[in-house]
Curated annotation (Swiss-Prot):
The keyword Transmembrane does not apply. The gene is DNA-S. Residues 9-20 have a biased composition (Basic residues). It is found in: Virion. It comes from Milk vetch dwarf virus (isolate 9). Belongs to the nanoviridae capsid protein family. This is Capsid protein.
Length: 172
């Protein structure tokens, strides 16, 4: 006996005119927005910047983000970074995150959730700067709307220059 149950657990009827219906996923148009930023980071300081589409985009939902960061620093130094989602804007980075480990402080745990994290360590000959970079592709699940905020937060052990580029995949 042939079963009429499909993979989703729903029973489908078959009619003589039309066979079993094919499940389909609705495709929503996606726009790609590239944003380029550069900044100077100070030693032993927690800093961050918001990841959002530039321009006159009023209503959107971010589904994916591709983050590329290039750092120029002396050998033997460390940069920690995390990518967080927040329900409200973050004004004071030092009040929200601990200094070397970038953990969320207890007073902000109900509004900030960590999505991804990582670190960059430099190696090379003493006396010369080396350039390091990292790429991070972040899938945001159901997405982040324009009322929520997405940040990249960094802690560095030495003053350095950062070039941050992100490509945001948004649904309008």
């Amino acid at each position: 006996m042939v079963s009429n149950w499909n993979r989703n657990g729903m029973k489908r009827r078959r009619t003589p005119r039309r066979g079993y219906g094919r499940p389909y996923k609705p495709v929503v148009p996606i726009t790609r927005v590239v944003v380029h930023q550069s900044a100077l980071l100070k030693k032993d300081e927690v800093v961050g910047c918001e990841i959002k589409p530039d321009g006159d985009v009023a209503r959107y939902k971010m589904r994916k983000v591709m983050l590329t960061c290039t750092l120029r620093m002396p050998p033997g130094e460390l940069v920690n970074y995390i990518i967080v989602k927040s329900s409200s804007p973050i004004a004071n980075w030092a009040a929200a995150f601990t200094a070397p480990a970038l953990l969320v402080k207890e007073s902000c745990q109900d509004m900030i959730s960590i999505i991804a994290k990582g670190k960059v360590e430099s190696n090379g000959v003493a006396g010369t700067d080396c350039t390091k970079s990292f790429n991070k592709f972040i899938r945001l699940g159901a997405g982040i709307s324009q009322t929520q905020h997405l940040y990249v937060v960094m802690y560095t052990s030495v003053a350095l220059k950062v070039v941050l580029e992100h490509r945001v995949y948004i649904e309008l």
